[in-house]
Structures are given as C-alpha cells and as structure tokens.
Amino acid sequence: MSPIRGGILHLPPSHESRYSQSLERGLAILRAFTPDRPWLGIAEIAEVLEMSRPTTHRYASTLVALNYLEQGPARKYRLGMRAGDPGRSAVNSTALRKLSPHCLGDLRDRSACTASLAVLNGSDIVYVDRARSLWQSQSEVSARLGRGSRLPAGHTAMGRALLAHRSPQEQREAIDTGGDQCVARAASTATGKLLEELGRIREKEFAIADQLHVEGQICVAAPLRERSGEVIGAVDVAAPKTTFSRTRILERLAPLVVASAEEMSAHLGYTPPR
C-alpha cells in the first residue's frame, strides 16, 4: 500500500516521533492547488485530502492569515503571495507566451522601444518574453534580462502594474520582502508612498518607473486580464530617458502600451464592462 493516502503521508511508527502531522497537512493543502484547479473551496480541499471540513477550514484559515492562501469570491481559495503562486504563474506564463511573439513585436515596432511581458511570482516579477528594439542601445543590466529573469516587483513598472491589482496585504508583503536594490535611493519607494502610488496606478491603468532598475531608462507598463477580469500579467516598454521626455511618455508611449495590453487581454477572452 502506498504511504500517501488522500494527499497525506502515513509513516511507519518508527518515524512518527520525528514527524509533524500539522505541518504536513498544511503543506498538503498547498499541494492540492494545481494549474488545472487554481481555485478550491473547503469541501473540495477536504475531499481531495480526505480530511473533515472543520479541520480543513482551520488549516485554511491559518494559511490565509500567514498569506500562503488568499480567499476570493464564493468562499474559494487560491495560492497566496508567500506560496509563490507556482501553479498560477505557470498557467499564466504559458497562455501569455502564445501571444507574445506577435503582440510584443508589434508594440516594439510601434514604440521603437524594447517591449517585455512578465507575470507576478511571489514578491518578484518573472519575465515571460522580450522583443528587443533593433534601434535602441541596451545597457548591460537591461541586456541580461530575458525569459525567466526575476526582479523585485516593487522596483519595476510591470511589477507595480501587477501589484496595483492585488490586496493591500499582498502589496505590503511584496514591498517588505522585495529587497533593497538600487531603487532604495528613490524616495518614492518608501512603503507608504509606494502603496499610495499603487492606488493611483490602479485607477489610471498604467505604471511608470523612472530609472528604478536601470539608470537612464523609463519603463511604462499596463496590466493584462484574462476572461474573468483577473490581472494575470503585465506588458511594458523600456525607453531611454535621453530620447523620451515625461510629456512624450504620457502622450505617446502610455497610450501605445495600454492599447497593446487591451488587445492582448481581448485575445485572452477579456471583455471590458460597459
């Protein structure tokens, strides 16, 4: 008989004294979430793990409090910020990668800037794809970025566009655990001010990062939505500050990025509310 039944590992008596069943059950709940079932209710989790509903609810409530799970509509749960959201990120990356060659290439050509696409994974963004500009010189830092590269979400335009649509708890978690790289010198990265900025980004639907990660580079990003309206990724362009003034950014690049994000969201099945 397999030692794993209902997602729970059953050890022989000789090992039980060194084994924490509570920890194992908590981890089993996290493992119950997969790319095919990103949202689960208490009854579904209890059935998968063969646990009682009261016990499952107690563990789930603890995981929510610790930000390993988050509770959404209809009392469903999904992996939270601290869980790293591997299942959801994998699904999002796959769906977005199918769109990226055409859409990113088109955005790059229209903006004459390098265009990128990323998803949120824990407190970082993970690059899904990039379309590099043939006319724009790349800094050493920017040139190293490619598929799979990670950056602290709060330090990037795409990260801020994504965090703007997460819960306040998740926003603070990402900011607190995002490290203190080169952006520490920018006053706008103070936690309180950044949280306020995320609120403004949510309203205007695009984010601007002025030399936050790469010296001399301004990035403009907008969120991508799937069919349900959930923000699952972000797209951006990276422009040299010597070429693009802030006025030109707002009047030319921001509308291009937002339009590209809307086009990609439509391909993902999203229809804006009327």
Where are the language model's segments positioned?
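Juxtadomain coupling helices with adjacent low-complexity linkers
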Residues: G192, G199, K204, E215-G216, ...
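Short, basic/aromatic recognition patches
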Residues: L99-L107, I175-A221, A266-H267
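Amphipathic alpha-helical effector-binding/dimerization core
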Residues: R78-T177
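Sensor-regulatory modules in signal-transduction proteins
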Residues: L224-R227
